[in-house]
């Protein structure tokens, strides 16, 4: 299974902790992430992560391309709903893309 990970800056530690807690399960799958999130997951878990560019410079577009080509089986996207930022549009774009291609997307620790 191909699992994609994205985390906004304020949620990167949460993503690290999540991946560390589920390291054994994640080790059986192909992991993909935007650049900085992927690097941090690798550092904490020692698992290999295929890394795209950072989201702010096109990594989110690379991520959506994988979804559109039906190469992503699920997405875990931790973002802070209390902060409006220039990256807010990527949340909606990736969410719409997942909905369009029937890819499950978790946006918090409980749904992940």
Residue ranges and their predicted role:
Residues 1-3:
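Extreme N-terminal starter segment of soluble prokaryotic enzymes
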Residues 5-12, 81:
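Short, glycine-rich nucleotide/cofactor-binding loops
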Residues 14-24:
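Histidine-anchored nucleotide/phosphate-binding helix
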Residues 28-37:
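Short internal beta-strands
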Residues 30, 47-57:
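Short hydrophobic/aromatic-enriched beta-strand-loop microsegments
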Residues 59-100:
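Mid-chain, well-packed structural core segment of small domains
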Residues 95-112:
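Short, acidic/small-residue loops that bind anionic groups at enzyme active sites
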């Amino acid at each position: 299974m191909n699992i994609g990970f994205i985390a906004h800056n304020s949620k990167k530690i949460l993503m690290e902790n999540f991946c560390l807690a589920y390291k054994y399960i994640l080790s059986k799958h192909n992991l993909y992430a935007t650049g900085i999130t992927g690097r941090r997951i690798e550092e904490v878990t020692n698992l290999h992560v295929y890394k795209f560019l950072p989201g702010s410079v096109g990594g989110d577009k690379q991520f959506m391309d994988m979804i559109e080509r039906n190469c992503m089986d699920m997405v875990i996207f931790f973002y802070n709903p209390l902060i409006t930022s220039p990256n807010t549009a990527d949340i909606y774009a990736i969410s719409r893309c997942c909905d369009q291609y029937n890819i499950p997307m978790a946006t918090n620790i409980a749904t992940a």
